[in-house]
Amino acid sequence: MKKVGIVMGSDSDLPILRKTMDTLTSLGIPYECHIYSAHRTPEEARDFAVSARANGFGVLIAAAGMAAHLAGAIAANTTLLVIGIPCKGPCLDGIDALLSTVMMPSGIPVATVAVNGGVNAALLSAQILAVEDAELAAKLDARRAADAAKVLEKDAALQAELNG
């Protein structure tokens, strides 16, 4: 199975990416995680992106807040799918990061999840890898079924409370 590459712009993004890593681990997906800044370590970020395919990555996730140029900087240097996670920062509740991540020029796409959407970034990565991996697809189906069962259990409890 190909790996997922995870890059964060700062260690302040780590709490969000721990959820990403936990989700990938629960699905048996290998990953690597690094801190590279689009502004402070642009050469390292570029080198990571350029060599990602040769290093066995199938999908890349880039998380950053505020100016949030990391996902775009990674996407500019690879044709692998890049998923951007805009991270909530000290102002604007992450809307600044969301707009910086989603507003990419034509020809350099970045798939973008919600602000602080680390779990969905992992699940989107898994869905992409599952296109060619039936075992992973089955794990995703099982996860969705378990999530649905939890909702139905909560509904049953609510109905019992209201009608009981």
Regions found by a protein language model. Name each.
Residues F48-P86:
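Glycine-rich phosphate-binding loop
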Residues D13-L17, T41-A45, A64-A73, L92-I95, ...:
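Short glycine/serine/threonine-rich phosphate/pyrophosphate-binding segments
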Residues N77-S106:
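Glycine/small-residue-rich loop that forms an oxyanion/phosphate-binding "nest" at active or ligand-binding sites
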Residues M8-P15, K19-T20, I95-G164:
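C-terminal binding/interaction regions
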Residues S37-A38, A63-A67, P86, T112-G117:
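Active-site nucleophile and cofactor-binding loops and adjacent substrate-binding regions
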Residues K2, I29-E32, T79-L80, V102-V110:
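Glycine/charged-rich beta-loop-alpha catalytic/anionic-binding loops adjacent to active sites
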Residues C33-A54:
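N-terminal beta-loop-helix "entrance" segment that forms/cooperates
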Residues K2-R40:
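Glycine-rich phosphate/diphosphate-binding loop of Rossmann-like nucleotide-binding domains
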